[in-house]
Amino acid sequence: MHQMTLAEIARGLADKKFSSEELTRVLLSRIATLDPQLNSFISLTEDLAITQAQAADARRAAGENGPLLGAPLAHKDLFCTQGIRTSCGSLMLDNFKAPYDATVVSRLASAGTVTLGKTNMDEFAMGSANESSHYGAVKNPWNLECVPGGSSGGSAAAVAARLLPAATGTDTGGSIRQPAALTNLTGLKPTYGRVSRWGMIAYASSLDQAGPMARTAEDCALLLQGMAGFDPQDSTSIDEPVPDYSASLNTSLKGLRIGVPKEYFSAGLDPRIAQLVHESVRELEKLGAIVKEVSLPNLQHAIPAYYVIAPAEASSNLSRFDGVRFGYRCEDPKDLTDLYKRSRAEGFGPEVQRRIMVGAYALSAGYYDAYYLQAQKIRRLIKNDFMNAFADVDVILGPTTPNPAWKIGAKTHDPIAEYLEDFYTITANLAGLPGLSMPAGFVDGLPVGVQLLAPYFQEGRLLNVAHQYQQVTDWHTRAPEGF
């Protein structure tokens, strides 16, 4: 039962082959047995899950029948969940229980999903390895000595290990797509504003976007359908009609124009990954796609620009955590200033402190024009590069990551090396574009992903390409040994 995809679960529930409660109990038992190896969950919500599963079964018995009704999933632990701890992977919020549900959580709950728990993540979503969590590193089920990617590493590891069929994640610079690539999943970052950020604890507000993580494009389409749509409570939400993502999955790729940027194949890319990217291109050509080379000339400036803009926004967003209203508070402060200093110094981990300091520096008087303003200008140039490319092609294809998963601890003391792992993913966030990673093979037994990018609000096109690719390849069906 645990091997089923979300779509298979939907069909099984509709055909009354099993109940949501039966499935939920099987998965909760599996999590209890296997997750100690992975550390993919921060909180389990067994009682809530059973209650929601029973309610879903009752709704189905009354004649209701939706694709997510009774489907089990987990939420990344930065989505507010009423009465349940929302820690953001940090000591700072270790005791925080939100008084409301995030829009993503409430929409999926209304569709009938069953919440099994909250997944582990890099502290405040800052990281590409899921090593900065206050609750310990998450392990990659494909090799327990390796990282699963980050910051949505808990969601990725749990789905890859078949602990559950799907999970929510967030993507600020690749935090859905990169862990999806490193754990053999399909992960989608929607267009900025497509999915509500209300109730999602912010890292960098102009870059953050929530999205689905699952084993197949078909499953991501089902989950995105339940997540997407305008939300008046989110000022950055865009009032754009939500199409039927599942309806376009089987569209032919004949005549689809795929662009491959020449700048993607630089010295930093593992040549074995480059080979797998070229093989995926050939598969899509067999399906009728037309492939041509495109150029993204400002790609080389993306990482410096991102690591000015994201920390700058983080330094502002995280200023609210001061030990006064909620969150961690130091013991016996001498005065208010001491309360602020010690609560933040003790409550935040080293990577979060590093990014706050970088961001505060970039925004400080005398440096704002030199750093932050210049970074925003580069952001505009990167967006323009994509607009020029999309004048000639429908989709852009390339690697998701320059390397497969690395050993836990290998890049802990070299943050720049970890930042470089975001090279291919951060441009979609800077430009606000939708991006998807899909399984494309293995290097040394570790999964590799290929990334697809499309114009604004063309998530359906990405899901269509990925689904058609998954009809002629079997990479996405491979499971890690022992799980």
Swiss-Prot record:
Active-site residues (renumbered): K76 (charge relay system), S151 (charge relay system), S175 (acyl-ester intermediate)
Gene3D superfamilies, sorted: Amidase signature (AS) domain
This protein's UniProt keywords: ATP-binding, Ligase, Nucleotide-binding, Protein biosynthesis
Example of a GO biological process term: translation
EC number(s) recorded for this UniProt protein: 6.3.5.7
UniProt GO cellular component terms: glutamyl-tRNA(Gln) amidotransferase complex
GO molecular function, one term: ATP binding
Entry-linked InterPro entries: Amidase, Amidase_CS, Amidase_dom, AS_sf, GatA
Pfam assignment, any one: Amidase
SUPFAM superfamilies to which the protein is assigned, alphabetical: Amidase signature (AS) enzymes
Enzyme class, spelled out: ligase
Reaction catalyzed: L-glutamyl-tRNA(Gln) + L-glutamine + ATP + H2O = L-glutaminyl-tRNA(Gln) + L-glutamate + ADP + phosphate + H(+)
NCBIfam families the UniProt entry points to: gatA
Family: Belongs to the amidase family. GatA subfamily.
UniProt subunit comment: Heterotrimer of A, B and C subunits.
Function: Allows the formation of correctly charged Gln-tRNA(Gln) through the transamidation of misacylated Glu-tRNA(Gln) in organisms which lack glutaminyl-tRNA synthetase. The reaction takes place in the presence of glutamine and ATP through an activated gamma-phospho-Glu-tRNA(Gln).
Designated name of the protein: Glutamyl-tRNA(Gln) amidotransferase subunit A
Species of the source: Pseudomonas syringae pv. syringae (strain B728a)
